[in-house]
Swiss-Prot record:
Transmembrane segments: 15-45, 60-87
Mitochondrial intermembrane side: 1-14, 88-227
Subcellular localization, as worded in the UniProt entry: Mitochondrion inner membrane
Function in brief: Component of the cytochrome c oxidase, the last enzyme in the mitochondrial electron transport chain which drives oxidative phosphorylation. The respiratory chain contains 3 multisubunit complexes succinate dehydrogenase (complex II, CII), ubiquinol-cytochrome c oxidoreductase (cytochrome b-c1 complex, complex III, CIII) and cytochrome c oxidase (complex IV, CIV), that cooperate to transfer electrons derived from NADH and succinate to molecular oxygen, creating an electrochemical gradient over the inner membrane that drives transmembrane transport and the ATP synthase.
Protein name per the record: Cytochrome c oxidase subunit 2
Record GO biological process: ATP synthesis coupled electron transport
Cofactor detail note: Binds a dinuclear copper A center per subunit.
Pfam family membership, one: COX2_TM
Length: 227
């Protein structure tokens, strides 16, 4: 869940987001070490009078500053590629949900059910109940079972949109005429909020996404009541 003046990432609630958080920390540590080394060298150059104007060739130094950056890039690339492959894997999803972006709302269709589909609009500020979040609540939440692989098929009816839920590590473009897919799985129940992350017009800021992750038994009861 996000909170005001937050500087870090949202709490991870999916295996993919946990991997992304670890990769972020891993890369940030490398960047911090490189920045510290560069600042240290710059400070030495500014505070010492020693110079090497007569040095014309230094094979050892050139070898080091060629091999070292290559090794650093490999340390960053390997875990990044691993996560990319993990994000593309979809292993026997138990449920498929088709998501369509519109100006300016989302529509959802549970393709495994005969007639389970609805539109999801933002609740206006004047209609919010105590404790609800401004610009993030919707009239119809996307109810999904937790701890199970779910496939999202994402597209758009009009312009470019982007279906994003930060705490699940999801951000997939909704492109007219093209069907993108993403897989999600939540480790625990709860409400997870997102928003359209592609500028799509005057009401771009009013396209929230709310996922309600529940145990499988509650999801089955909900789906039965909706059909």
């Amino acid at each position: 869940m996000a909170y005001p003046f937050q500087l870090g990432l949202q709490d991870a609630t999916s295996p993919i987001m946990e991997e992304l958080t670890n990769f972020h920390d891993h890369t940030l540590m490398i960047v911090f070490l490189i920045s510290s080394l560069v600042l240290y060298i710059i400070s030495l150059m500014l505070t010492t009078k020693l110079t090497h104007t007569s040095t014309m060739d230094a094979q050892e130094v050139e070898t080091i500053w060629t091999i070292l950056p290559a090794a650093i890039l490999i340390l960053i690339a390997l875990p990044s590629l691993r996560i990319l492959y993990m994000m593309d894997e979809i292993n026997n999803p138990v449920l498929t949900v088709k998501t369509m972006g519109h100006q300016w709302y989302w529509s959802y269709e549970y393709t495994d059910y005969e007639d389970l589909c609805f539109d999801s609009y933002m609740i206006p500020t004047n209609d919010l109940k105590p404790g609800e979040l401004r610009l993030l609540e919707v009239d119809n939440r996307v109810v999904l079972p937790m701890e199970l692989p779910i496939r999202m098929l994402i597209s758009s009816e009009d312009v470019l949109h982007s279906w994003t839920v930060p705490s699940l590590g999801l951000k997939t473009d909704a492109i007219p005429g093209r069907l993108n897919q993403a897989t999600l799985s939540s480790n625990r129940p709860g409400l997870y909020y997102g928003q359209c992350s592609e500028i799509c017009g005057s009401n771009h800021s009013f396209m929230p996404i709310v996922l309600e992750m529940v145990p499988l038994k509650y999801f089955e009861n909900w789906s039965t009541s909706m059909i």
